[in-house]
Amino acid sequence: MIIVKLTANRICCSLLQLRRSYEHFYIFVFLPEIPLFRFSHLKLFPKNLQIQRLVSAMMERTYGRRKPGIPRTLSDSLNDSVSQTEYLSSSSSPDIEPIDYSLLPFSSQESSSLWHSSSRSNFREDYPQNGGVVRRAKRVRNGAEAAAFTSTLLEAQEFGELMEHEDEVNFALDGLRKGHQLRIRRASLSSLLSICASQHQRRSLRAQGISQSIIDAILVLSLDDIPSNLAAATLFFALTADGQDEHFMESPKCIKFLIKLLKPVIVTSTEGKPRNIGFKLLSLLKDVDAARDPVKMDDPSSSDILSRVQELLVNCKEMRLNDSYITETTRPELSTKWVALLAMERACVSKISFDDTSGSVKKTGGNFKEKLRELGGLDAVLEVVMDCHAVMERWVEYDALSVQEKKDNLHKQSLMLLLKCLKIMENATFLSTDNQNHLLGFKKCLGSHDSRMSFTELTISVIKMLSGLHLRGGFSSPNTNNVNSHYSNGGNHDSVLEANRKVTNEVVTISSDTYSTVGSISTRNGSVSQRSQSIIHLDFSPTSMSGSQSSVSGNEPTTSKTRVGSTISGSFAGRLASLGSDIARTTLRTTQAGEPICKKFGEFAPPEESEDPFAFDLEDYKPSKWAVVSVNQKKSRAQKKKGCYKQSKDESLYQLFSSQEESSNHRLNSQEESSNRDCSTSLQPSHCTNDIDEECLCLLFDCLLTAVKVLMNLTNDNVVGCRQVGGCRGLESMAELIARHFPSFTRSQLFSEMEKTGSSHQKKDKYLTDQELDFLVAILGLLVNLVERDGVNRSRLASASVPITKPEELQESEQEMIPLLCSIFLTNQGSAETKEETTTFTLDDEEAVLEGEKEAEKMIVEAYSALLLAFLSTESRSIRNSIKDYLPKRNLAILVPVLERFVAFHMTLNMIPPETHKAVMGVIESCKSP
């Protein structure tokens, strides 16, 4: 508290000087014959009319009639010619009638304040730079100025509040300058996070031109503190996510800043080192405190930043509040890498337009993804993908998660980072041939592979591992009886961490500013796919940890999607759906890449004395007895539910799944002998089942779907991409995905009759879920791209065989791909044309509308499967006859009506390229011939 005795004409100037020196202040002013009153934030208090007039006069002298946002120098107050006596006499003059402030249009409380004032606000150092703006000359006072004085008072009141908001930002920006202590930097970033929390506040900052100043200050920060990095990344994303700064986002300084955020933070740990008196004295002079210690990350300033980051991302609808996380420290989304990848993903989304005359698709808007490739951004994202790939390989190898990794949700963080990277690749390859070619030309050695691996091989390997994990139901808790229990117990943890460091890329310092770039974009021949997704963890990941998630939230990732059964196919993404009760889900033990830098962030750790000499002794860091009892009760209830869940498992289904997995393992092992780059994902199922983590299943499914769409974009009208995917056994991998994730097509009554009689007219009325439909259409679209212009791929797909398990035999057998594709076509061959003629319904009939939607979805699958069979039939006479054997009346003419509707639909929308139209018309004529 500061007690000041000043004259009236000096009070405002002194107040501004005091605000530059103190964070928290209350100013009490002693004036002759005037009672003590509080002067706070230039607001009026309507209790004493004499004081009101005095304060309003001072406000007019300070701010005058200048517009908001125009700075005013301190010399303006010193050079005023009107003295204190003149103001006092004018305020007490009998010529001026008393003003009834209750009748004013608004008061200081009624005026719209865009955000609450923060105690951590100050003026920027250069605020009075250039001498400020000279305000207009003061008019000569006279007795007839009462109305004008009232108008000035209202304007000054409004302008004062606007200046208050600007002062908050300026004060926070002042704390971001070099030379300030770390706690001041964190406090300033926390204040800016609260200021930018809502959309209307960010719009106000943009209108006043303040948002650019905030971004400029963030771009020059030294990224050596994890909480500060998270706050800076979140502010950058929030202020640039509206898409109005496309050209600014394309600047090298913005892209390099995002790339720096993807690099690991090098922090020298002080754990285990005694802190002597010299260290304590040094901490008083320099910014050396426990906040830089990666183990002591549960200090109040870090927790405050985490809570504000979560609030801002929730307001931006990038994540949801989730009660399952006890604190913000356990949220896997609150990561610097994740927020940086989120900003890249949003900036890579392309705006497209359709040319009415030519029917072509054109990209409009900025060239962020092209600049990202040129400056090395795509290469940096690829490094994160490789780190996530190494993490998943260790999950497969060790088959266990440590207790701490499970507690900190590090496996979810890796999947979220991977998802965000895949989304960037999908958006970057959309309508960008340069980015596609850059990814297709990528080759790099991974830690677990002796030879160089291409991006196509890397993506297919990721798909295989994700598929295996998804079919097993996610992850299991560590088991002491496991072969690798020594890892989860920490017995051999250091050696594992050392191996992890060797596998991953070397640590790159934050100051690095040289990178190379990659790009990519998503378009499909019969369909163009693009998807923008979003989700949200403080960057505790080591060099090998990284990953990502369109609009995904903490508990249930959500995705925006557009479904078009045509040349332009929107995002076929969705959340995970149950794949049927015939698959008993078992859990897979996994191991993470290594302990994160700040792994113990969420643990209770009381600060040491040397952390902050002015800090309070926070003895309540440890959980209370009541909290411990509550946690124990929750654990016991969870264990009871877990036991009931185990007892309710269907043993016969488990045996079926075990048989299928064992046979699948044998086949994949034979594939590994021929290719060292194929990664087997069909691991032996764990014999101890656990509660299924639905959030993990959603992440696994979204990653799997997005990876397939990345390959679909790389093969769209790209001969090199089609050859690469085909040469890396991509066709066989997609065939296995269909057989394993859609067993209904191989186990249905229709498929059994097809094997016996060669054809069947009976169809099983089974609708796919939204998630199954998205995944199946993406796979079929990729297969269409692969076989449309490549005869070698057509022969490979026609001769491919997939492992299937018949329920009655409980054993695995090989099945050719052509019967499976015919089963998909006939199962989804709806009677839409007959229903269209005989059935009429209104929009009020909800059931009829839903039925029509399901029929439309079946028509999409029917069209793509028919197009795929038609392309295969043009390769050779033997393949053509094989397809006929599984169609009714051994005639390909059944495909013609479906293909004609497909072409007519696209012609109506004028969305089919001439090359595609010519190719489809050619296969239609081929199907008409006997």
UniProtKB/Swiss-Prot annotation:
InterPro entries tied to this protein: ARM-like (IPR011989), ARM-type_fold (IPR016024), WAPL (IPR039874), WAPL_C (IPR022771)
Domain WAPL: residue ranges: 854-909
Functional description taken from the UniProt entry: Regulator of sister chromatid cohesion in meiosis which negatively regulates cohesin association with chromatin, acting as an antagonist of CTF7. Cohesion ensures that chromosome partitioning is accurate in both meiotic and mitotic cells and plays an important role in DNA repair. Essential for the prophase removal of cohesin during meiosis thus determining the timely release of meiotic cohesion. Important for proper spindle attachment and assembly during meiosis. Helps to prevent abnormal centromere association during prophase I in meiocytes. Required for early embryonic patterning.
GO biological process, one term: meiotic sister chromatid cohesion
Region called Disordered, residue ranges: 540-566
Species assigned in the record: Arabidopsis thaliana (Mouse-ear cress)
Keywords of the record: Cell cycle, Cell division, Chromosome, Chromosome partition, Meiosis, Mitosis, Nucleus
Knockout mutant characteristics: Fewer leaves, more flowers and higher germination rates.
Full protein name: Wings apart-like protein 1
Annotated Gene Ontology cellular component terms: chromosome; nucleus
Localization, UniProt: Nucleus; Chromosome
Record family assignment: Belongs to the WAPL family.
Quaternary structure and partners: Interacts with the cohesin complex throughout the cell cycle.
Polar residues biased stretches: 554-566
Residue ranges with Low complexity bias: 541-553
Tissue specificity annotation: Expressed in roots, leaves, buds and siliques.
Keyword Ion transport: no
Pfam name, any one: WAPL
